[in-house]
């Protein structure tokens, strides 16, 4: 959760550094309150709405508008995480934070959380490019072949992790490996979540 909230804060500051929600988002990202994840998400999506969409945008799997783009992007991310969990012999059915939710692979959802903002950034980039081309918000929100190619390329974006530059996909693998080490060691020390810095986009 620390990494996810921190990454959301970092991205929101890039999107709109003077947005009135930024100060509260920074504060919530480091608090110990139990509602931190939900509150950070609310603030994060308010920044997105005011920057890239419109003020009545609501993030939700079953909502309309740009939500379909985010749903598809997260499906790509989930597939990547599952691939590495299976390769490492980790059962995705046993999670940490998501075990009580309706997910079939809660561990995958746990480990993908810090990476969501990377895909959020590339979805926002897609929306920006579409609107610059004169497309309507409705057209920009369509899942086209070009969008699929654009969002899949997120996995090849160059990122920093463990003081090394690597494709985002390699960072996902490294995080899964570090989680496996933590499980085998019986302690959280070996686990290294991904922290978002500069991303050099592929595609």
State what each model feature region is.
Residues 1-203:
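Active-site helix-to-loop segments that bind/position phosphate- or nucleotide-bearing substrates
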